[in-house]
C-alpha cells in the first residue's frame, strides 16, 4: 500500500504517548533521527493523543536512501555546526534571491542559533559528564538513547524543565550586538530569527530571566523580564511583515535541519 511507504512505526500505548507528547519538536528529532513524527490532526493539547506515527524522512525510493546519512552517530562541535548552518543559510538566501540585508541576517542568525548550548549544564548533558577542558558540542552522537534516559539525563545535568537553548542564544547575540553597536533593525531581526529557530517565542517565551539563565543575565532580564522580546517581535512584524518573518524563519530552520541531517 503506497500510504504505508516510509512508515517506521506506530505508537498506541497510552503511557508512552503521554511521555512523547510533552517533548519539544527538537527533542523528538533527537529521539527519532531521520524520521518525522505525525500526530492525530486537530488533537487537543490538553488531552493525550490516541496515536503517533513515525515516518521515515527518506522514502524507500529516494535517490539518497542511505539511512546512516540521516542520523548522527558521532559528536559534532558547536563551532562547526554553527558555521555550517550560517553557510547553508547564506546559500539558500543567495539561491532564492533574497535582498542583501535579510540575507545577511539569515547568515548571522545561523552563526548564533545554537550558541546557547555553551551553557555548562547543556554541555554536561551532551558530553554525558564533566565538560571541563573539552570543546563545546552541538550534537552528542549516539542518538538512539531511550526517552526515559534522555529526560533523566537532562534532569541530572541540572537543566530546568522546558529550558530553551535558543532563548539563551538570542540573549547572547542581543548582548554582543549591543556591544558592537549593531543597528536596531538588523539586531532585532537576527535576535528574532535565533530565538524562534525551534518554533517558540511568537510572541512570548514561557520563561522568566532566572529560569532562562544563568548566562547572559542582563540580556535575559531585558528581553523576557522587561518585555523587550515582545517589542522586537512587534517591530520585526511591522518592518518585514508577518509573512516575511515567517518565511525567513522557515529558511533558517531549513538550513539547520539539512545540516543536521547531513551529520554536520
Model-derived regions: residue spans:
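Acidic/His-rich, divalent-metal-binding segments that scaffold phosphate/diphosphate chemistry
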Residues: 1-154
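Divalent metal-dependent catalytic cores for phosphoryl transfer on phosphate-bearing substrates
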Residues: 69, 75, 97-264
Amino acid at each position: 500500500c503506497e500510504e504505508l511507504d516510509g512508515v517506521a512505526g506506530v505508537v498506541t500505548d497510552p503511557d508512552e504517548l503521554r511521555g512523547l507528547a510533552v517533548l519539544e519538536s527538537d527533542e523528538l528529532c533527537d529521539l527519532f533521527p531521520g524520521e518525522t513524527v505525525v500526530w492525530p490532526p486537530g488533537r487537543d493539547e490538553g488531552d493525550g493523543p490516541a496515536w503517533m506515527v513515525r515516518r521515515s524522512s527518506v522514502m524507500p525510493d529516494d535517490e539518497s536512501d542511505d539511512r546512516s546519512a540521516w542520523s548522527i552517530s558521532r559528536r559534532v562541535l558547536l563551532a562547526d555546526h554553527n558555521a555550517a548552518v550560517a553557510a547553508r543559510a547564506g546559500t539558500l538566501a543567495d539561491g532564492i534571491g533574497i535582498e542583501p540585508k535579510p540575507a545577511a541576517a539569515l547568515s548571522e542568525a545561523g552563526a548564533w542559533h545554537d550558541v546557547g548550548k555553551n551553557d555548562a549544564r547543556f554541555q554536561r548533558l551532551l558530553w554525558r559528564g564533566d565538560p571541563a577542558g573539552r570543546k563545546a558540542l552541538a550534537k552528542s552522537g549516539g542518538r538512539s538513547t531511550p526517552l526515559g534516559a534522555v529526560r533523566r539525563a537532562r534532569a541530572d545535568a541540572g537543566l530546568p524543565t522546558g529550558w530553551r537553548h535558543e532563548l539563551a542564544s538570542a540573549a547572547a547575540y542581543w548582548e554582543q550586538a549591543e556591544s558592537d553597536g549593531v543597528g536596531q533593525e538588523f539586531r532585532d531581526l537576527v535576535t528574532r530569527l535565533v530565538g524562534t529557530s525551534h518554533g517558540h517565542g511568537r510572541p512570548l517565551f514561557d520563561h522568566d530571566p532566572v529560569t532562562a539563565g544563568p548566562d547572559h543575565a542582563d540580556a535575559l532580564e531585558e528581553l523576557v523580564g522587561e518585555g523587550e522580546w515582545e517589542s522586537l517581535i512587534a517591530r520585526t512584524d511591522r518592518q518585514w511583515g508577518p509573512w516575511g518573518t515567517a518565511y525567513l524563519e522557515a529558511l533558517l530552520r531549513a538550513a539547520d535541519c539539512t545540516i543536521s541531517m547531513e551529520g554536520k
